[in-house]
Swiss-Prot record:
The lineage of its organism: Bacteria, Bacillati, Cyanobacteriota, Cyanophyceae, Oscillatoriophycideae. Gene3D superfamilies: 4.10.410.60. The gene is rpmI. InterPro entries: Ribosomal_bL35 (IPR001706), Ribosomal_bL35-like (IPR021137), Ribosomal_bL35_CS (IPR018265), Ribosomal_bL35_sf (IPR037229). Residues 1-22 are annotated as: Disordered. This is Large ribosomal subunit protein bL35. Belongs to the bacterial ribosomal protein bL35 family. Keywords: Ribonucleoprotein, Ribosomal protein. GO terms for molecular function: structural constituent of ribosome. Residues 1-11 have a biased composition (Basic residues). The keyword Ribosomal protein applies.
């Protein structure tokens, strides 16, 4: 059976936690157009790394077979 292919776009955006049971991701909306967003919003809410939601985890794992 041939090797499974990894979706490279997903590989750049997601990584496993230390235990490998969960998947980490960056929060959206902190790339550009930042002038009108408050410093508190950018620092506290958008800077945190968060986990992929349980309902989306299956799809992410299909895109990353060797995660």
């Amino acid at each position: 059976m041939p090797k499974l292919k990894t979706r490279k776009a997903a590989a750049k955006r997601f990584e496993a936690t230390g235990s490998g049971k969960k998947i980490k991701r960056r929060k959206a909306f902190k790339n550009h157009l930042l002038d009108h967003k408050s410093a508190e919003r950018k620092r506290r809410r958008l800077s945190q790394i968060t986990l992929v939601h349980e309902r989306d985890e299956k799809e992410v794992r299909l895109m990353l077979p060797y995660l």
